[in-house]
């Protein structure tokens, strides 16, 4: 009888263990299914995708607005810079300007300004370049603050500049290549210092440096 009781107890324990393991496996499977359903919830994924799409659209709109703002700012600036001068204004500028020929190709606008600054206040120096390759053409224009300074500048004709004898003439109407209907190269920069722009094909100095005095006409000019 004792052996039978022990056998029954063992069978009962085994059945109990099997039932317990079965319940645990069922619970684990249920948890895994729930986790899987949460990970691949189509509604949640759709919401996430929509939020991402909205963020991308907002970023595109922001970039487009930034581009529009830049274009508007650039357009207003360009508009101010390209306001055409009247014929009278161009002629008045020409009366205060000289043509300088045989300029060394390596010369800068600042060097020309230094060479002529003893003649009077200089508003602008422009070295013309070829539009195709950006190389200097070998001549320049100098605009003074007053037409009275032009006579002094003409006395600089045939002086040496960077080892070359330059040619200085008044900028006149009807002179080939020196028409008053043509302004200085576009894109000139106002302010002190030289500015070089290959795109606009010119090197320009703009400023107002006080005259230091001209030491007479000779083959050498000492500006200081």
Curated annotation (Swiss-Prot):
MF terms (GO), sorted A to Z: poly(A) binding; RNA binding
Annotated spans, Disordered: 1-40
Tissue specificity: Expressed ubiquitously in all transcriptionally active cells.
Disruption phenotype: RNAi-mediated knockdown results in reduced alpha-1,3-fucosylation of chp. RNAi-mediated knockdown results in overproliferation of testicular cystocytes undergoing transit amplification leading to increased incidence of spermatogonial tumors.
Chain segments annotated as coiled-coil in the UniProt record: 9-74
Alphabetically ordered keywords of this record: Coiled coil, Cytoplasm, mRNA processing, Nucleus, RNA-binding
Acidic residues composition bias: residue spans: 1-36
Subcellular location: Nucleus; Cytoplasm
Biological-process GO terms, alphabetical: co-transcriptional mRNA 3'-end processing, cleavage and polyadenylation pathway; mRNA 3'-end processing; mRNA splicing, via spliceosome; nuclear-transcribed mRNA poly(A) tail shortening
One Gene Ontology CC term in the entry: catalytic step 2 spliceosome
Cross-referenced Gene3D superfamilies: 3.30.70.330
Major location category of this protein: nucleus
Residues annotated as domain RRM: 96-173
Keyword check for Nucleotide-binding: no
Matching PANTHER family: EUKARYOTIC INITIATION FACTOR 4B-RELATED, EUKARYOTIC TRANSLATION INITIATION FACTOR 4B/4H
Function in brief: Involved in the 3'-end formation of mRNA precursors (pre-mRNA) by the addition of a poly(A) tail of 200-250 nt to the upstream cleavage product. Stimulates poly(A) polymerase (PAPOLA) conferring processivity on the poly(A) tail elongation reaction and also controls the poly(A) tail length. Increases the affinity of poly(A) polymerase for RNA. Binds to poly(A) and to poly(G) with high affinity. May protect the poly(A) tail from degradation.
Assembly notes: Interacts with ZC3H3.
Entry comment, domain topic: The RRM domain is essential for specific adenine bases recognition in the poly(A) tail but not sufficient for poly(A) binding.
Record protein name field: Polyadenylate-binding protein 2
Species for this entry: Drosophila melanogaster (Fruit fly)
């Amino acid at each position: 009888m004792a052996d039978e009781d022990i056998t029954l107890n063992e069978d009962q324990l085994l059945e109990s263990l099997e039932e317990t393991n079965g319940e645990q496996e069922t619970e684990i499977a249920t948890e895994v299914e729930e986790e899987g359903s949460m990970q691949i919830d189509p509604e949640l994924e759709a919401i996430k995708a929509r939020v991402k799409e909205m963020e991308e659209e907002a970023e595109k709109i922001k970039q487009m607005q930034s581009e529009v703002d830049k274009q508007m700012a650039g357009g207003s600036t360009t508009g101010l810079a390209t306001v055409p001068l009247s014929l009278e204004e161009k002629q008045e500028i020409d009366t205060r300007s000289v043509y300088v020929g045989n300029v060394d190709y390596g010369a800068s606008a600042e060097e020309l300004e230094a060479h002529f600054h003893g003649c009077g206040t200089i508003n602008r120096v422009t070295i013309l370049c070829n539009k195709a390759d950006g190389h200097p053409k070998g001549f320049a224009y100098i605009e003074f603050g007053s037409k009275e300074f032009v006579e002094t500048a003409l006395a600089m004709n045939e002086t040496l500049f960077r080892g070359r004898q330059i040619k200085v003439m008044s900028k006149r109407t009807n002179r080939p290549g020196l028409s008053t209907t043509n302004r200085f190269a576009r894109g000139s920069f106002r302010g002190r210092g030289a500015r070089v722009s290959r795109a606009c094909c010119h090197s320009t100095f703009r400023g107002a440096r006080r005259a230091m005095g001209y030491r007479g006409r000779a083959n050498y000019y000492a500006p200081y």
